[in-house]
């Protein structure tokens, strides 16, 4: 069996003593307490020694208690003056009592029946009673005397005289826990020690001096157990979800996408709905599905030509469409709201101008009324994007979406279902299979309708998607509650795995 120098020394000395108090063993080995404790614990893990620990509650005097042990308890000092004078005022007691002691002791003298209290000429007067003249040593006095004689006494011994809480209440004594440790050699340890152990001091560090002198050839180096349990270290790292978003962004840029950015979380309904060919009477524009700003209520519309084309698309249609057939309201389009989906930025970018062919994306915070649960939030992130080009079709879109789910989220199974959105045709919903939650919807996609793209100045196909990136993160981070992404739980933040 392999033992370190300190373990060998401790075992040899323990074999001489057979059983010893820990402090005695420390003295016998000449090592410090930490080294002996470490050696004992290792010997115990190897079955060569046993460590016994016995904890006991003890009571000891506080600084106040030590003062009382020297000059007497306040009530006895006050009673001494009363016995001498028979009757005293509070000013008389101030000669022997501090301000802190005076008020409680007056009450205590009356409670013990040692003095009566009355007013004379507007002053409080204390007069000694028969009980005060005959007062004898009490339990608290005996306990104080006992504590003064010894440095510490077991609580059980003190409580044969008085409850320790009574002493603590008067700040005479305090309670502590002491642990007595005893170390005992086992038969296996005794057998090994009797065989003879070679004590050769070990070197734990290879120094330049050892190398220069050549002594490194003669000394014995301490062996290190690389499998020994050690304290876990939690180095600084990015918030797991934030790190995931950064890697999504980097991956999309590597795939040739250009990031669309915007400073504000607030949009006009024009960009959130109207520019996307969503009619003003659509139920998704009501308070049940979107938030509205109370103040300021309205913003500004973009250039007149763009507004006129959007209005025409809604009222009469573009690209062979008949439109929605209603009177479009610019006042409704000017209303302000927290962004409900990242597609609003896609509309802005298309109106601003794009490269053809071109690929664009954005990661944005969006807001929607919902019931909070483990798969739904009212404030969350979306990855929205689009690809614009001459020969794009629906199959290209499905390929991009599947690549997202499999390569970026790590989903094993993906399925597509037909869906409806006012601004895409055809439209599709994408879901992926989560091992805990089953099929989880990620988002929607489709080909932007020509009524939308023509109004924004684009006359080639545009395939687009909006994906709930928070739900993708659930797959990659291995969690089954979306709320953990924004959690302050230190345990989760420390243990959450870093993604690829």
Swiss-Prot record:
Q: Tell me, which GO biological process terms does this entry list? A: phenylalanyl-tRNA aminoacylation
Q: Which cofactor does it need?
A: Mg(2+)
GO CC terms, sorted: cytoplasm
Q: Where does Mg(2+) bind?
A: 425
InterPro entries reported for this sequence: aa-tRNA-synth_II (IPR006195), aa-tRNA-synth_II/BPL/LPL (IPR045864), Phe-tRNA-synth_IIc_asu (IPR004529), Phe_tRNA_ligase_alpha_bac/arc (IPR022917), Phenylalanyl-tRNA_Synthase (IPR002319), WH_DNA-bd_sf (IPR036390)
Its localization reads:
Cytoplasm
The record's keywords, sorted A to Z, are: Aminoacyl-tRNA synthetase, ATP-binding, Cytoplasm, Ligase, Magnesium, Metal-binding, Nucleotide-binding, Protein biosynthesis
Q: Describe how the cofactor binds.
A: Binds 2 magnesium ions per tetramer.
Q: A Gene Ontology MF term for this entry? A: tRNA binding
Binding residues annotated for L-phenylalanine, in chain numbering: 343, 382-384, 423, 448
Q: Which NCBIfam families match?
A: pheS (TIGR00468), PRK04172.1 (NF003210)
Q: What name does UniProt use for this protein? A: Phenylalanine--tRNA ligase alpha subunit
Q: Which gene encodes it?
A: pheS
């Amino acid at each position: 069996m392999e033992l370190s120098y300190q373990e060998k020394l401790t075992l040899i000395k323990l074999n001489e003593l057979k059983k010893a108090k820990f402090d005695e063993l420390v003295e016998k080995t000449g090592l410090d307490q930490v080294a002996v404790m470490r050696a004992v614990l290792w010997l115990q893990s190897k079955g060569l020694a046993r460590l016994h620990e016995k904890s006991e509650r003890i009571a000891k005097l506080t600084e106040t208690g030590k003062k009382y042990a020297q000059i007497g308890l306040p009530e006895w000092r006050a009673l001494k003056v009363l016995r001498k004078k028979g009757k005293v005022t509070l000013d008389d007691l101030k000669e022997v009592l501090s301000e802190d002691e005076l008020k409680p002791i007056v009450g205590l003298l009356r409670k013990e029946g040692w003095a009566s209290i009355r007013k004379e000429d507007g002053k409080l007067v204390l007069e000694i009673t028969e009980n005060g003249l005959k007062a004898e040593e009490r339990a608290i006095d005996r306990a104080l005397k006992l504590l003064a004689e010894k440095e510490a006494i077991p609580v059980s011994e003190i409580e044969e005289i008085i409850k320790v809480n009574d002493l603590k209440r008067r700040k005479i004594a305090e309670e502590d826990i002491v642990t007595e440790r005893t170390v005992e050699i086992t038969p296996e340890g005794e057998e090994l020690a009797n065989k003879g152990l070679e004590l050769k001091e070990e070197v734990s560090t290879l120094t330049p001096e050892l190398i220069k002198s050549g002594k490194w050839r003669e000394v014995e180096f301490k062996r290190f157990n690389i499998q020994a349990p050690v304290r876990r270290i939690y180095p600084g790292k990015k918030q797991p979800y934030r790190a995931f978003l950064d890697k999504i962004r980097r991956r999309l840029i590597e795939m040739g996408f250009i990031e669309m950015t915007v400073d504000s979380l607030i949009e006009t309904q024009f960009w959130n709905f109207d520019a996307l060919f969503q009619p003003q009477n659509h139920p998704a524009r009501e308070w049940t599905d979107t938030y509205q700003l109370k103040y300021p209520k309205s913003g500004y519309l973009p250039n007149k030509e763009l507004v006129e084309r959007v209005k025409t698309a809604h009222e009469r249609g573009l690209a062979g469409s008949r439109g929605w057939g209603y009177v479009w309201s610019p006042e409704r389009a000017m209303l302000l709201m927290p962004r409900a989906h990242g597609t609003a930025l896609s509309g802005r970018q298309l109106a601003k101008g794009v490269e053809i062919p071109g690929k664009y994306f954005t990661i944005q915070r969006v807001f929607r009324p919902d019931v909070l649960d483990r798969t739904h939030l009212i404030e969350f992130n979306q990855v929205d994007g689009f690809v614009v080009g001459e020969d794009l079709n629906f199959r290209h879109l499905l390929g991009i979406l599947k690549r997202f789910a499999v390569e970026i989220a790590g989903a094993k199974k993906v399925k597509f279902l037909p869906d409806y959105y006012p601004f895409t045709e055809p439209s599709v919903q994408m879901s992926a299979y989560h091992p805990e939650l089953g099929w989880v919807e990620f988002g929607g996609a489709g080909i932007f309708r020509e009524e939308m793209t023509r109004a924004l100045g684009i006359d080639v196909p545009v395939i687009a998607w909006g994906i709930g990136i928070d739900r993708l993160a659930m797959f990659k981070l291995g969690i089954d509650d979306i709320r953990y992404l924004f959690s302050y739980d230190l345990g989760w933040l420390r243990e959450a795995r870093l993604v690829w």
